């Protein structure tokens, strides 16, 4: 491609509204332009990268035995009503009516559509297992689109769905897809972790996320220092260690009028934060217990996903408001604790091991110090309620936990019969009777992969694509003063035609621009291999080569240039 015939839309300045590196560089490199909040036009450079990522995904999915299909973006509301998600899905689901006043949605995912398709097309157990996938646009009406294409409203996704007669068959395909995803992200050159995860609104049983490690990530990824254990922080089990010590002091009621938070209590009374607890009041799941207290250590964070799995806690978890709390307990949120508490309580496992600790007295402006279980308050049920912390023991007993930020780029689920039962998706079994199909679901955020690759691989000059396979161009020809030097123009033209004929994705910068501008643009868009042709070097029989990844420069004999590029460039 010649730059003179290309839409080359680089920017010198970083737009003010771009918060993360990938958004900044995708705008500056001329990959995307915003049309509206969370909606982007993809320009030629961006499309080239996107299609290369799609092709890698497609190749690996095909190797794994999946078959490509294409389903409509617009979906019938009847299918969503049949599955039960019409009522369950929140405002992210864009709903509209056609001219016949029939309800439709703009698809955020395709479980309903694929289940409907397969129940129509597959009738016998002999046709299973079956794994179908598509690469297609999705729409989710995010309340706060941000970070460019990392969290946009419209995005490209690869979603696959498998259908089985048994759980064992699903498990086999799940393991194949786990390996396919590992192959995809390895081939993309990403530093990633496959982690155990919560199934969320998709539903199902087993689930793994594929997280690209990056400081700008929205998820906390937890992994062991000495084993393969890895999990999303939402799912990582917190292990309580040690034994509860015997009481050391008598319980004391203390005036704390200016201590509304744990931080204020610790500072004003010089208490170790790990010797305090905080009491959080949430809505209960039953009429008998409309409010429930969750008690965790002062230095720990509540894990809402874990908490809402307790049978006493409403799912989804909802915090009680101040009015409800005061009406029931008689004190505000800054003065709550386990002593004389008149609602059911659940304590974190670590709280069960505490002694001589401080907590609110359920009287405004007062706290109890030196509380001990059984002596001062009945021991409630202990449950895993908290997020793990850096340095906690690994749940598998090997090593301690590290926590890093991650960008979720892939997610695989064992759906089981959640959708097939709801939508009566059956085949004839071996015994001739109807058999409800068992399903799996496997997604990759294609547009997010592009952003994640940039988050991991960039420098002050621009993008550094982790592999030649996804760079918009693999080789840049930069002829200096070509329009004034016939020898430079002729050599550059010959090299361009030769590389094109060899199938190399090459960009020929034939603009009448200063060399510095040309270099900066090619580095900004991340072309991994740059060939710089200057008249003086050409007269000496040499060509300058620059490697974008390691920054190295070297002079190559011009008669060896093609052989050198063949050895170093992945076409």
Swiss-Prot record:
Keywords of the record: Aminoacyl-tRNA synthetase, ATP-binding, Cytoplasm, Ligase, Nucleotide-binding, Protein biosynthesis
Top-rank EC class of the record's enzyme: ligase
Disulfide bridge partners, by residue number: none
Biological process, per Gene Ontology: prolyl-tRNA aminoacylation
Ligase listed as a keyword: yes
Alphabetical list of InterPro entries matching this protein: aa-tRNA-synt_IIb, aa-tRNA-synth_II, aa-tRNA-synth_II/BPL/LPL, Anticodon-bd, Anticodon-bd_dom_sf, Pro-tRNA-ligase_IIa, Pro-tRNA-synth_IIa_bac-type, Pro-tRNA-Synthase_IIa_type1
GO MF annotation list: aminoacyl-tRNA deacylase activity; ATP binding; proline-tRNA ligase activity
Record's subunit section: Homodimer.
Task performed by this protein: Catalyzes the attachment of proline to tRNA(Pro) in a two-step reaction: proline is first activated by ATP to form Pro-AMP and then transferred to the acceptor end of tRNA(Pro). As ProRS can inadvertently accommodate and process non-cognate amino acids such as alanine and cysteine, to avoid such errors it has two additional distinct editing activities against alanine. One activity is designated as 'pretransfer' editing and involves the tRNA(Pro)-independent hydrolysis of activated Ala-AMP.
Record-stated family: Belongs to the class-II aminoacyl-tRNA synthetase family. ProS type 1 subfamily.
Domain commentary: Consists of three domains: the N-terminal catalytic domain, the editing domain and the C-terminal anticodon-binding domain.
Annotated protein name in UniProt: Proline--tRNA ligase
Organism: Actinobacillus succinogenes (strain ATCC 55618 / DSM 22257 / CCUG 43843 / 130Z)
Lineage of the species this protein comes from: Bacteria, Pseudomonadati, Pseudomonadota, Gammaproteobacteria, Pasteurellales
């Amino acid at each position: 491609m010649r730059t003179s015939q290309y839409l080359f839309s680089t920017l010198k300045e970083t737009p003010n509204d771009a918060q993360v590196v990938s958004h900044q560089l995708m705008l500056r490199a001329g990959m995307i332009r915003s049309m509206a909040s969370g909606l982007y036009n993809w320009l030629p450079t961006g499309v080239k990268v996107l299609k290369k990522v799609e092709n890698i995904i497609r190749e690996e999915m095909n190797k794994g035995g999946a078959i490509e299909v294409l389903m409509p973006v617009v979906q019938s509301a009847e299918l969503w009503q049949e599955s039960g998600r019409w009522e369950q899905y929140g405002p992210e689901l864009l709903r509209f009516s056609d001219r016949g006043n029939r309800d439709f949605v703009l698809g955020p995912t395709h479980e309903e559509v694929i289940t409907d398709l397969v129940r129509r097309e597959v009738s016998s157990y002999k046709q299973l297992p079956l794994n179908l996938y598509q690469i297609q646009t999705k729409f989710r009406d995010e309340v706060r689109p941000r970070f460019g294409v990392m969290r946009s409203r419209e995005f490209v996704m690869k979603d696959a769905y498998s259908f089985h007669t048994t759980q064992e068959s699903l498990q086999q395909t799940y393991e194949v897809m786990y390996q396919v995803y590992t192959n995809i992200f390895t081939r993309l050159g990403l530093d990633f972790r496959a982690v155990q995860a919560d199934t969320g609104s998709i539903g199902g049983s087993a689930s793994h996320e594929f997280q690209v490690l990056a400081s700008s990530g929205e998820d906390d990824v937890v992994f062991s220092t000495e084993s393969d254990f890895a999990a999303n922080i939402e799912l990582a089990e917190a292990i309580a260690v040690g034994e509860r010590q015997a009481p050391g002091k008598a319980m004391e009621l203390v005036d704390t009028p200016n201590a509304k938070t744990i931080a204020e209590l610790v500072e004003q009374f010089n208490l170790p934060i790990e010797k305090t607890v905080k009491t959080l009041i949430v809505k209960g799941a039953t009429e008998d217990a409309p409010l429930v207290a969750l008690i965790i250590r002062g230095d720990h964070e509540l894990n809402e996903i874990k908490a809402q799995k307790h049978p006493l806690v409403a799912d989804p978890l909802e915090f009680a408001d101040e009015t409800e709390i005061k009406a029931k307990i008689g004190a505000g949120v800054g003065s709550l604790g386990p002593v004389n508490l008149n609602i059911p309580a659940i304590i974190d496992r670590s709280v069960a091991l505490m002694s001589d600790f401080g907590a609110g007295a359920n009287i405004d402006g007062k706290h109890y110090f030196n509380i001990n279980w059984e002596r001062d308050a009945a021991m409630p049920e202990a449950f895993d309620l908290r997020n793990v912390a850096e340095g906690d023991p690994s749940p598998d007993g090997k090593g301690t936990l590290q926590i890093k930020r991650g960008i979720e780029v892939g997610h695989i689920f064992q759906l089981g019969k959640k959708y097939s039962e709801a939508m009566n998706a059956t085949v004839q079994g071996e015994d001739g009777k109807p058999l409800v199909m068992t399903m799996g679901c496997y997604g990759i955020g294609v547009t997010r992969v592009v952003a994640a690759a940039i988050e991991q691989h960039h420098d002050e000059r621009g993008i550094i694509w982790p592999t030649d396979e996804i760079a918009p161009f693999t080789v840049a020809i930069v002829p200096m003063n070509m329009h004034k030097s016939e020898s430079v123009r002729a050599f550059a033209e010959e090299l361009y035609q030769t590389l094109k004929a060899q199938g190399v994705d090459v960009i020929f910068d034939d603009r009448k621009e200063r060399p510095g501008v040309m270099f900066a643009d090619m580095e900004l868009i991340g072309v991994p291999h740059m060939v710089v042709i200057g008249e003086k070097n050409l007269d000496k029989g040499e060509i300058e080569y620059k490697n974008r990844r390691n920054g190295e420069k070297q002079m190559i004999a011009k008669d060896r240039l093609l052989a050198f590029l063949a050895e170093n460039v992945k076409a």
